[in-house]
Structure formats: C-alpha cells, structure tokens
C-alpha cells in the first residue's frame, strides 16, 4: 500500500487514480445531469433555503458519474462532503477526478486493495480544523459499521481479534492502527453523528438487526425501501446493468444459454427479465415460497442450485445471503461456466474456497479458476458487484430516483433529527410520490388528475398520497 495511505496523510486532501481524467469526468457529469431530473429539480427547489448548511456528510457509496451528480446536489444545498467508494472495483476514475478537482475530498480509485478500502473509509471521517462528520450517507453499511465496531474495540479489543475472512483481516488491522494512534478515535466521531441514510438492502438488514438488538446509536432512514428506489433501481436498473457487465467482461452470446438467477426479489426479477429478453432460458432458485411462485407464474423454472450446477451456463447471485454458490457447486459446473454476483457483498459466492486452485487473470475483473481436472470457471469481479466491477452500473435516469430519495432523506434527518428515535424509518409516502412525479416529464408521461368527486369516492386527497402504506406496488 502507498505510504501516504497508511499514515492517513496526503499533501492534497484527496486520493484518486489520475487527475488528468477530470475534464472527461466533467463532460460525463454534464451529460448525466440531463438524465437526472429529480436531483436537478431538487437543487432548484432548495437552493435558496440551503437546508444542508452545516451538514458534514461522510459518504460511502460507489464513486460513479451518477454519484458525482448526487455529491454536487448535496453541496449545492449547503453540505460539506467527504467521499469514499463502498466497493473496491466500482469507482469510475474520471468521476472521482472530476469531483476532487471541484473541491470535494474523494478517496477512491478502481481496483483498491482491501487495506486501501478501509483506510479510505476512515478518511471520510477525518475532517480539517477540528471538525467532525455529523451525517453518514451509506451504501452497504460499511461506514456505519466502522464507527460502531471501532467504538466497541476501544473498550474491548477482543472484538477485532478473530477475523474470519480477508475483508475482516483488513478491517481489523485498520482499526488497530487507528486505536494505537488515538484510543478514542471512533467514539469521538460516533458522538457527533446525527443520523444515517442507507442505500441498499444489505446495509438496511444490518440497521434493522442493530435496532432489534438495541444497538443502533442514531436514527436511520432506510432509503432502499422507498418504492421509487427498490421498485426502480433494484428492478429496472439491474435489468439493464447486469447484462452490460456480463457482455463487457466476456462477449458471450446470451441467447440459447441456460442462466440461473439465485434470488427472485426486486434485483433478481430485473436480472431474470434481462437474461430472458436476450434469449436465455432462465432458471430461478429461491427459499421464499411467495417469490418462488412469482417466478414460476412468470414462466421461469424454479430449481435448486444443486440441480442447476452441472447444467447451466451462466450463474448470477442476487440474494444478499452467504455462500449461495459454494465450492461444490463450482466444482460441478460445466467448462467455461460464467459465475457472477449482483448483490452488495462478495460473500454470496464462496470465492475463498477456490483460492487453492490456479487463477488465470484474463483482464481486469475477469478470472478463470482452473480446477484440477483442467476445467475452467469464469469468475467476474472476484464475486463482487458485476454491474459496477465490469461495467458502469445503473443508468443515470434510474439512479436519479434513488439519489433524490437520498437527498430528501439527508435533509429530513439533518433538519428534523430531534423528531426521530434511534430506530430505522422510511420516507413518508408523499415524498415517495414526489420523487416519482419529478421524473415523469423527462419520459413524456402525463398524469390523470382526479376530480373532487373521484377523490372523495376512493377516500384520498386529489393530490395524494394515493395508496396506503401497506400497498404493495
């Protein structure tokens, strides 16, 4: 690792791959804005009010072009921001350079080591002039985890003494290093946090678990379960970005192949649609009888991974779970089977068990795992997010939905935080509908307006909300 990274000091308050890429990044940011009407209109609505003035946001989310538009929306509304990526492969280096050149400290480049990743996660909490972050914007929960676990380790270092995987080895080492330098580094920073807004399913699971156990130290807004996030980003975003990643990585013809999608939630639904749309025969694995029935009713064959392992050509995990594809599954696969993950963490595929075999790196984020019999399994992005590791993630338009929710959630927690207990909340229905409304004109959609009589007949305000909270879209 670069020495400047180890000691957390740098002559400039950013670490990116190549600042000469900044002008290219700026051009793409300008293009992305034309596809992100929610963020652009939110800037316009709040630019005078400056609701985030005084907010110091520690951001941990994929450093893409679309995230750059989010960052510049937050700063336009008054926030100071420091940023790291939440995945070692997901940064778009020209985006990071453009944002750093504009003055926001960014610590991210594509292909970070795990040591660098966790060091950069610390850097977003290291503010100049004796100040501290007071808000977290998280994706996957790593920034939140870092402060909470570090605070526990201040009292008892045994909690970081037994790593179970290479990720924890790097995390625990980074915490040890910071505690040696400052025994109260984490609790000092944790005490200043007013709240967190969480982007994705995996991070939300962590928050709900902490709430259930009474360990959540500040209020949290679950952005993932806003309808305009989960039913759009997770579904339509994955429907476009999954096959983009697979095809950029492998140039494989998807038509005629058997593709297995593990998990039929919103992400899995989008993945299955895209693979079928390109002519694959799609099988689905599921643990939930409701999701399994949905898949079957859509015409997908519902099977087990044990059944599919030696028959399919392409495997995609979309569960948020652990070792959904294990060593024995990969050992049984056909020669040149493609294995990838679109869930947040790399634990869905048991990659560690294959390190005993020879790996042949074909190009960045594409590896052949060579089994003793000579068979090769093609692993994409080392089991991390294939759409961001091997492509550029979701399109700008759908990310405008998600990031408008993030912006509104940051405003809500920062300005109204005293109304919230240390629990997990979702944005109210009227804001969900507002986010959708902001995006209609861009795609030529025109709403029908209820008459007073019609609104009275179904018992809603003619301006919304139009559905009860329990409604399933």
UniProtKB/Swiss-Prot annotation:
Keywords: Cytoplasm, Hydrolase, NAD, One-carbon metabolism. It comes from the Bacteria. Pathway: Amino-acid biosynthesis; L-homocysteine biosynthesis; L-homocysteine from S-adenosyl-L-homocysteine: step 1/1. It is found in: Cytoplasm. One of its GO terms (molecular function) is adenosylhomocysteinase activity. Binds 1 NAD(+) per subunit. This is Adenosylhomocysteinase. It comes from Paraburkholderia xenovorans (strain LB400).
